Amino acid sequence: MLAEAKGHAMGLRNHRLDGPTFQMREKIFAIGDDFWIEDAAGNKVFKVNGKALRARETFILEDAHGNEVSKIQEKKLSVRDKMTIESGSTKATVHKRLIGIRDHYTIEVEGGEDLKAHGNIVDHEYEIERDGHQIAEVSKKWLRVRDSYGVEVNDPADVVLVLAVTVAVDALAHD
């Protein structure tokens, strides 16, 4: 019942994982554009700050108090489009795998297990896996709010990394 009450504030419909759920705006990637990520209760919990006037696309993920928790940055001069993520001591590189019809992204995590994002990335219907186990799901179907999509994370310890990966994947998919 508590999950239903929490989810109701952001227009949340059915979802599958037991962890925290967040709402993100759909078309978020104008450089210099900032937006808030809200939790299931509608609280502003993270801010994505699109840095303008940079040579490469950069987004800063901040907590509700304005503290930087992650930097997501386009990696220039590589064969394939890539974005790097720095979240505290965690460093990761997100890049698109060119196989098949469906979108697949690989997230190489330094010193940790790599992640995979696959599904319909452009329509915000995909999941993120670690070692074959789903750690997050991204879906528009849960929300009644127009131009928004939900991100549900299985383990609260993965929230910052998953949200940063979601920002990077979205930026690469809509580049």
Model feature map: region roles:
Residues 2-175:
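Intrinsically disordered, low-complexity proline/glycine-rich segments
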